[in-house]
């Protein structure tokens, strides 16, 4: 009841009682049907708590509120926006990102799951088995509106076939290079050597810019692809130029600072 009272005068104007429950008149704001706020037994619905939570966010003047929903909950978005309209709340800074489902594969076989039968594989299970970093890397690799096939065997593989391992190995190589040489990042750089590795240097210089761009676009998958591309470029250059040079030192130092 405190939640419903928190909606203020709007609650009185835009609700009605039906079959012992209290309903919100969201159809007046382009929702496909009115929504229950309080059940017959007086218990609040998830909808009421979500509306109250977002109202609190809006009232506290948050710059941005990002909601991440499963794609199967896309119908929930108009319900919430209708509630904001009912309350005459500006919701321009509230964003909704929809993510598709994840399919787990082990030994080439898709793992079947059913909540009804109590058969499922939790994220905590994956974390214990693989560690959090590799999970984040693979889960962020796909664009949110694309389904994902997560290969558990590939995630465990310690070879260049595993993009996460390959990216880590690039960082290890950077650290190894810096540990073997004395390098002052403020010293003059041999421009001829820079010309020979323009691609890798330009990627390093552009990293802060693309990071900001990906954040504003809400596209973490683009950052993962940038890391994969940079790692491949670095490994290729390293293998072609095994001898320490100004370019390798400069790039390694920059990569270490930005990792």
Which positions does each model-derived feature cover?
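Cationic, low-complexity basic patches in intrinsically disordered or flexible, solvent-exposed regions
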Residues: 2
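Non-catalytic interaction-recognition regions
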Residues: 5-8, 12-252
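A short, hydrophobic C-terminal helix/tail in secreted or cell-surface proteins
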Residues: 253-259
């Amino acid at each position: 009841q405190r939640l419903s009272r928190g909606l203020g005068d709007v609650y009185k104007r835009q609700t009605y009682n039906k079959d012992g429950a209290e309903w919100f008149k969201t159809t007046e704001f382009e929702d496909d049907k009115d929504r229950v706020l309080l059940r017959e037994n007086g218990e609040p619905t998830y909808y009421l708590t979500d509306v109250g939570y977002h109202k609190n966010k809006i009232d506290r003047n948050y710059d941005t509120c990002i909601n991440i929903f499963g794609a199967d909950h896309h119908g929930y978005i108009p319900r919430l926006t209708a509630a904001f309209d009912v309350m005459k709340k500006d919701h321009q800074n509230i964003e909704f990102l929809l993510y598709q489902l994840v399919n787990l594969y082990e030994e080439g076989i898709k793992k079947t799951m059913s909540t009804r039968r109590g058969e499922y594989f939790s994220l905590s299970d994956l974390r214990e088995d693989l560690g959090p970093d590799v999970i984040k890397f693979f889960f962020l690799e796909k664009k949110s509106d694309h389904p994902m096939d997560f290969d558990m065997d590939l995630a465990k593989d310690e070879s260049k076939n595993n993009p996460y391992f390959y990216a880590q190995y690039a960082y290890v190589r950077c650290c190894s290079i810096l540990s073997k040489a004395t390098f002052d990042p403020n010293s003059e750089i041999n421009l001829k050597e820079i010309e020979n590795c323009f691609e890798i240097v330009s990627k390093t210089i552009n990293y802060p810019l693309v990071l900001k761009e990906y954040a504003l676009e809400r596209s973490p998958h683009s950052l993962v692809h940038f890391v994969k591309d940079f790692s491949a470029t670095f490994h290729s250059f390293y293998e072609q130029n095994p001898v320490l040079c100004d370019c390798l030192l400069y790039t390694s130092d920059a990569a270490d600072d930005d990792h």
